[in-house]
Amino acid sequence: MRLCDRDIEQHLEEGKIVIEPRPDSSRISGVSVDVLLGNEFRVFQAHTAPYIDLSGPKEEVSAAIDRVMSDEIYIKDSEVFILHPGELALAVTHESVTLPDNIVGWLDGRSSLARLGLMVHVTAHRIDPGWSGRIVLEFYNGGRLPLALRPGMVIGALNFETMSGSAARPYNKRTNAKYKSQQGAVASRIDQD
């Protein structure tokens, strides 16, 4: 069952869901909590690898990812990150989110931003039960104009569902969890599959 605003506020108050820094009530509406854009970004460096063979040997996949991903880029609150049409970039939410093992979260983009061509998650919008960390955003500009993204802007909304029971293998207990406790714009770790 999806949590309504009153349930979200109660779960935050009781510490069942933790969002740091805690959002004020103006950012909680209906069935969601607005999340803000953080300061860390990563971009793909052009022409540094001819392709990435996703089913190739792990060492080769890892080396190719290292070649194409930039180091983390820090954008000050007063600055903007420009996402050009057709570009993919990684960013991170300002908030860190911790979920118990019986709640799953979902990240949705904002309709107003989507109408300008901005996708905030390419496909990965589920936040697993047991998750703890900041949420990586997979930005894609499908529009025709460059978009200026400013740290601190409302970038998406989280909503939460209670599950039929507690997960037997929540994210924080899995030994193979690749992004456990992530705090920055972590690049793909597909080579660890």
Swiss-Prot record:
User: Which Enzyme Commission numbers does its entry carry?
Assistant: 3.5.4.13
The catalytic activity, as recorded, is:
dCTP + H2O + H(+) = dUTP + NH4(+)
The active-site annotation reads 138
To which pathway does this protein belong? Answer: Pyrimidine metabolism; dUMP biosynthesis; dUMP from dCTP (dUTP route): step 1/2
Q: List the disulfide bonds.
A: none
Say if the entry is tagged with keyword Hydrolase. yes
Residues reported in the UniProt entry to bind dCTP: 110-115, 128, 136-138, 171, 178, 182
Domain of life, per lineage: Bacteria
Q: What does this protein do?
A: Catalyzes the deamination of dCTP to dUTP.
Q: How does it assemble?
A: Homotrimer.
UniProt protein name: dCTP deaminase
Name the species this protein comes from.
Answer: Tolumonas auensis (strain DSM 9187 / NBRC 110442 / TA 4)
Protein's gene: dcd
